[in-house]
Amino acid sequence: MDVVEVTEGRTRFFVSRQDPHLQFPPGSGQVFYNSRMEMNRDATVLLLSVLRPESYLDAMGASGVRGLRVAHEVGIPVTINDWNAKAVDLARQNVEALGLVAEVTHGDANVLMSGRTFDAVDLDPFGTPAPFVDSAARSAGNYLFVTATDTAPLCGAHLKAGMRRYFSRPRNTEYHAEVGLRTLMGFVVREVIKYDRGVEPLFCYAHEHFHRLHLRLRYGAAAADRALARIGYVMQCPNCLYRSEQTGMLPEPEECPLCSAALVPVGPLWTGGINDDATLAAMQEALPSVTAGTGARIGRLLATCRQELDTSSHYDYHVIAKRLRVSPGRIETVIERLVALGYRASRAHYSGTALKTDAPLPVLEKVVSGG
């Protein structure tokens, strides 16, 4: 296999050579490696340096970069698995070159996770993680991390695929990135609570072409019930920007108070908070001591997530301004005015124009229009 040496964080490793002239170079190598996911891996290394689980499974390792970095930079016991024999050979080569004591296994991830337990289980497949979440929920002791790159089904752009994979009806709204993250979270929670286990989000975010969950698992039916209580729906008006939130297994019919249209249920999805502030604060404190090529971006993301409201949807500031036919001013000014009126308001990490508030839509529109 033709390989090249790459560095991420403090780890040097070999990856399969790719054709840079193709539209998607990672798919051209004999073993998959996507350099665009470096931020995802940097964040994982940072979080694990705070959590320090007793063992860690990189269930779909490919070249092994995620597991290699965890073993080398965090120093915890790591197992790297892949079904591709060439990937396993490359991962073993990387383990040996780094002088690591790490286990590399060859086989189906579901079979491995069905037979063994790990303190932290990490799912980072190509595409949807849906076929692996059930076995991961049984294998993970305290932590479950999940990446999804099938953003179109999760966000409602490919509706039928989203319904098949996640048993949810996402909707392609102006807050579609948050719909995708919460749809993924809702699916994972429903898979976990079957086993009388609860879920607590630690650090969950959407970025470019992926959604990422870092979750703490709790034991007991009471913990499962607490998680179940946060499954629900965003009820979206098809005619205007009004939306409301409902919790429960089935949505109740609801009418838009602004235009009388029947609200459309989006979900089921997770309606609760998506981050734990103490965890984010610990990550911020640890960031200077971690070598991360995307450290500046992670720092900005953590800062935004810490002040982001826990409402289940956000508004796109520019969409509101366009509907009102006004020129959008500074988003910070809108937030300041909402807070001055007694409402909560913040930016959201999903985009530069994402705004969260508990103010009624007419109040928000009045503030945006300068009234």
UniProtKB/Swiss-Prot annotation:
The major lineage groups are:
Archaea, Methanobacteriati, Methanobacteriota, Stenosarchaea group, Methanomicrobia
What this protein is reported to do is described as: Dimethylates a single guanine residue at position 26 of a number of tRNAs using S-adenosyl-L-methionine as donor of the methyl groups.
Q: Which residues bind S-adenosyl-L-methionine?
A: 41, 66, 82, 108-109
Task: Tell me which HAMAP family the record gives.
Answer: tRNA_dimethyltr_TRM1
GO biological process assignments: tRNA N2-guanine methylation
Membrane-crossing ranges are: none
- Give the organism the record lists: Methanoculleus marisnigri (strain ATCC 35101 / DSM 1498 / JR1)
Q: Which residues bind Zn(2+)?
A: 237, 240, 256, 259
Give the catalytic activity: guanosine(26) in tRNA + 2 S-adenosyl-L-methionine = N(2)-dimethylguanosine(26) in tRNA + 2 S-adenosyl-L-homocysteine + 2 H(+)
Give the enzyme class.
Answer: transferase
Q: Where is the Trm1 methyltransferase domain?
A: 4-368
List the protein's name. tRNA (guanine(26)-N(2))-dimethyltransferase
MF terms (GO), sorted A to Z: tRNA (guanine(26)-N2)-dimethyltransferase activity; tRNA binding
EC number, as in UniProt: 2.1.1.216
Tell me which family the UniProt entry assigns to this protein.
Answer: Belongs to the class I-like SAM-binding methyltransferase superfamily. Trm1 family.
Name the Pfam families for this protein.
Answer: TRM (PF02005)
> Which Gene3D superfamilies does the record associate with it?
N2,N2-dimethylguanosine tRNA methyltransferase, C-terminal domain, Vaccinia Virus protein VP39
User: Which UniProt keywords are listed?
Assistant: Metal-binding, Methyltransferase, RNA-binding, S-adenosyl-L-methionine, Transferase, tRNA processing, tRNA-binding, Zinc
